[in-house]
């Protein structure tokens, strides 16, 4: 036996909606169905912080009267007196209402209100006999009628897709969801403040690009009617931010959206938030140190600590991050390989074929040894990088915007940061040689012509900017959504995006 009632059916919900619409119709007849002349002067969390520690005698002596407003989440009518729970943006507070104080008419009106209604209460703060901090209603008003019943407290929003699709209901019902997005805001705020403290200038660059660039990705395409030209939602702000370095801003950053017309998964949303920053006279080693500290600051801002728990495993961001080359990571995390094998293109290609990779199609069909090693790393080692780890020294052929190493042929001064097996950041010493950059763009165009949809276009204006001279520069992009997943112990990227992309409802 159980005392939990079954979840309401669609027929029950339709009946409740009809009843609530009838109540709203009666309110409209009074001429004030949705009043807008009440301003609260207190929030639930503030009341608990100030008065939870006081006893009733002290509260009576303080004689504190407050005005609160929010959504009614619980209602218990007990004859001449009732209790309700009011939920505002900060938390919950109990409300006590009695007929003798409110009067017959106002108390009768309250009894007709429904769970989910937005209400306004004015009265003194007190404690019940059980010690519950409450507001004793001297007046009570209905501010906004809720026509749709909320999920009941026991069943909540059980359908995960419904939580994403109707995030407003999820936020009403689920404390953990609200905490996730509050933590996200704190993390972004912490990053922004750290960047400003380090002397970076926050900028905004175009969201519509005439040429997609700055990343290897498939763009969304649109048309600019006034200019009669094809445009692309930006896949990255990189080339515009580096134009600003050319223009004389020595440290810039941007926190904004990128758009990539690719798959949806627990790690990917086609619309996502990135923080990209560029610093003149910095290289990739400086970037790694700076990024490491920045992520710690974000963790502390969001959670109060740099030591976290993610999916029931400890995640320690307080210690120095590991740094491994692609081959070192394969040798450490994938079993059975030798350096000699990894240096043999035929062997690596055969291994990739065994693992199910399409080595005959783009981009691997034309790949050199470095790109093949990277593909093997992605197949065998990437998911095992639980500890924060920088993978460094990426091959030139997969790093068209990164500066080449002065000491190793075919290698760039580039890193990617992995935490819990996910890429969190990508950075490098920037290529500032315009002739080298033009040649790499041409190689990307050849790859695109050969069928690689994610290869870059040739951006002549960016080359022109480099020809004016760009100082030695380092730049990095941090995936805000994936970082927030770590900081909030969220298994899916959809859990940290307020309104993730979903298929249309039937």
From Swiss-Prot:
Keywords: Aminoacyl-tRNA synthetase, ATP-binding, Cytoplasm, Ligase, Magnesium, Metal-binding, Nucleotide-binding, Protein biosynthesis. Mg(2+) 2 binds at residue 423. InterPro entries: Aa-tRNA-synt_II, aa-tRNA-synth_II, aa-tRNA-synth_II/BPL/LPL, Lys-tRNA-ligase_II, Lys-tRNA-ligase_II_N, Lys-tRNA-synth_II_C, NA-bd_OB-fold, NA-bd_OB_tRNA. SUPFAM superfamilies: Class II aaRS and biotin synthetases, Nucleic acid-binding proteins. The keyword Nucleotide-binding applies. The keyword Aminoacyl-tRNA synthetase applies. Coiled coil: none annotated. Binds 3 Mg(2+) ions per subunit. GO terms for cellular component: cytosol. GO terms for molecular function: ATP binding; lysine-tRNA ligase activity; magnesium ion binding; tRNA binding. It is an enzyme of class 6 (ligase). It holds the Pfam family tRNA_anti-codon. Mg(2+) 1 binds at residues 416, 423. It is found in: Cytoplasm. CDD domains: LysRS_core, LysRS_N. Gene3D superfamilies: Bira Bifunctional Protein, Domain 2 (3.30.930.10), Nucleic acid-binding proteins (2.40.50.140). Its cofactor is Mg(2+). GO terms for biological process: lysyl-tRNA aminoacylation. Its EC number is 6.1.1.6. Its main location: cytoplasm. It catalyses: tRNA(Lys) + L-lysine + ATP = L-lysyl-tRNA(Lys) + AMP + diphosphate. Homodimer. Belongs to the class-II aminoacyl-tRNA synthetase family. This is Lysine--tRNA ligase. It comes from Bordetella pertussis (strain Tohama I / ATCC BAA-589 / NCTC 13251).
């Amino acid at each position: 036996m159980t005392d939990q009632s079954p979840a309401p059916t669609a027929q029950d919900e339709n009946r409740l909606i009809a009843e609530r619409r009838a109540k709203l119709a009666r309110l409209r007849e009074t001429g004030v169905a949705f009043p807008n002349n009440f301003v609260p002067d207190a929030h639930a969390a503030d009341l608990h912080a100030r008065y939870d520690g006081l006893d009733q005698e002290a509260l009576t002596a303080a004689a504190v009267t407050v005005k609160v407003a929010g959504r009614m989440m619980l209602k218990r009518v007990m004859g001449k007196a009732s209790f309700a729970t009011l939920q505002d943006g900060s938390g919950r507070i109990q409300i006590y209402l009695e007929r003798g104080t409110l009067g017959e008419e106002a108390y009768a009106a309250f009894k007709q209100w429904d769970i989910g209604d937005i209400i306004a209460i004015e009265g003194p703060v007190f404690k019940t006999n059980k010690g519950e901090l409450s507001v004793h209603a001297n007046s009570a008003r209905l501010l906004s009628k809720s026509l749709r019943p909320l999920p009941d407290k026991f069943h909540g929003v059980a359908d995960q897709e419904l939580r994403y699709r109707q995030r407003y209901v999820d936020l009403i019902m689920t404390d953990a969801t609200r905490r996730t997005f509050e933590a996200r805001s704190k993390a972004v705020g912490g990053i922004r403040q750290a960047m400003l403290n380090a002397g970076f200038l926050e900028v905004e660059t175009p969201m519509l690009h005439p040429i997609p660039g700055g990343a290897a990705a498939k763009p969304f395409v649109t048309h600019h009617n006034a200019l009669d030209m094809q445009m692309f939602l930006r896949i990255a702000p990189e080339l515009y931010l580096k134009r600003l370095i050319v223009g004389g801003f020595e440290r810039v950053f941007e926190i904004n959206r990128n758009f990539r017309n690719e798959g949806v998964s627990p790690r990917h949303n086609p619309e996502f938030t990135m923080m990209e920053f560029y610093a003149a006279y910095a290289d990739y080693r400086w970037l790694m140190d700076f990024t490491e500290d920045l992520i710690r600051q974000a963790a502390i801002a969001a959670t109060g600590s740099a030591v976290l728990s993610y999916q029931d495993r400890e995640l320690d961001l307080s210690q120095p991050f590991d740094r491994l080359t692609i081959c070192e990571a394969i040798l450490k995390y994938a079993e059975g390989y030798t350096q000699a094998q990894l240096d043999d293109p035929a062997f690596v290609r055969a291994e990739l074929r065994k693992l199910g990779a399409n080595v005959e199609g783009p981009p691997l069909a034309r790949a050199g040894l470095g790109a093949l090693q990277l593909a093997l790393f992605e197949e065998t080692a990437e998911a095992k990088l639980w500890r924060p780890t920088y993978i460094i020294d990426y091959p030139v052929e997969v790093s068209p915007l990164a500066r080449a190493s002065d000491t190793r042929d075919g290698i760039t001064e580039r890193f990617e940061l992995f935490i819990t097996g996910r890429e969190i950041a990508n950075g490098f010493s920037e290529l500032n040689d315009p002739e080298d950059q033009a040649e790499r763009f041409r190689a990307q165009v050849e790859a695109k012509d050969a069928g690689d949809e994610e290869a870059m276009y040739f951006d002549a204006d960016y080359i022109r900017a480099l020809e004016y001279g760009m100082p030695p520069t380092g730049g990095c992009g941090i995936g805000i959504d994936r970082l927030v997943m770590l900081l909030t112990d969220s298994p899916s990227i959809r859990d940290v995006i307020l309104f993730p992309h979903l298929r249309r409802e039937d």
